Amino acid sequence: MVKTVDDLQPGETAIIKKHSVSGTLGKHLREMGLINGIPVKLERRAPLGYPVEIKIQGFSLALRKEEAKAIELE
């Protein structure tokens, strides 16, 4: 089973293995530091579960469900 950002619990940290977000959004995520080998921490989930807030390289980023499920972790 592949672990994704969607599987993390608040406060949990993991290392990015890869992501399958394509197109312009994928490019923006890579530019913001979502690249292989970088640690990512799940800060919190919205009351209904999405979006999720992650902390990566010192800044916070909100991800939709589809994006969180597309980021695979080690």
Question: What function would you assign to each model-found segment?
Answer:
Residues 1-74:
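Compact, glycine-rich, soluble single-domain proteins
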